Amino acid sequence: MKLIFCIDEKKGMMFFGKRQSQDSVLREWIINHTTGSNLWMSNYSAKQFKDLTGYIADDDYQIKASIGDYCFIEDNGYALEGVSEIILCDWNRKYQADKVFDIDLKANGFKKVDSEDIKGSSHDKITIETYRKG
């Protein structure tokens, strides 16, 4: 399983139950990147993808996802069991946050294998880093 998170410069994800930001170009990147695999997300996350296709909205997505599937995580908890890859999409901005990405990637055996910057619709630069276990 592969997990996708959006984070700010301090690894923040949400504030008072709401996403920090969103970007239409990043949504399209996620859909294109996961083509050929299942992309799972919560019903909350699916609201921002409503104009796109190629995802499965189900609040039990991490239980239902299979080995090669992707899970886009915003509002739900997550576990590392069975996770082979983590993609961090960094807004390159600081936002207020009370929910943060708290996985110590190195301590859990993940190594950075790729990094790219994209120009978003509402962000000049979004840095996308891919980490793989092993």
Across the structure, where does each feature detected by a protein language model lie?
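Enzymes that bind and transform nitrogen-containing heteroaromatic metabolites
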Residues: 1-134
